[in-house]
Amino acid sequence: SEVITEQFARIAKKEVHLEVEEVGGPLGYRTRFTAVTTRDGALGFRQARSNKVVPVSDCRILQPELKYQELSNRKWKGDLQVEVSISSTGERTIATGYTRDETPVRTSEGPDIARYAVNEFPLEVSQRSFWQSHKEAPRVLTEAVLKFAQVKSGDHLLDLYGGVGLFTSQFLELVGESGRVDLVEGSKSATGDALRNFA
């Protein structure tokens, strides 16, 4: 809640008070992360509000299946961005790219497309597409949206900033044959994933 309160104060010049509901425990919840390497190839994370890379040998907020300790023991090339994710099926993807240029990261290990299931609806997510990093977030967010949206058969919905189709996947069955869901997304990668997810 401190981050949100700070952003409202800094950007919107408004004072807000929030109550944040904790979802799951404080450790082992992240399914994806972006790390960087030092010039010498040590894996770590950027210091807050800085470009300084702090080598880290373990990160307890990550799901154990990401095997961060094993990754931190590798000898990496210097000045790399390392993006790692784990799917619902347990497949780990590692994508790398150099931090000193604008070249997009490329998958170096694992599948190019991760598979997730939210309330039994399968979704495919490319490495470049956004996906929630907290393992419970997709479920919790869809439950909250469904509770407040009160979607009925025959409704016409707009899923703005719809990404790969997290909310659309839940809305389709509710609106039924007489309804419609239009997903709007600007990311080429996420749009491609959404087209594949709803083909």
Task: Provide a role label for each language-model segment.
Residues 1-199:
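Accessory RNA-recognition modules of RNA-modification enzymes
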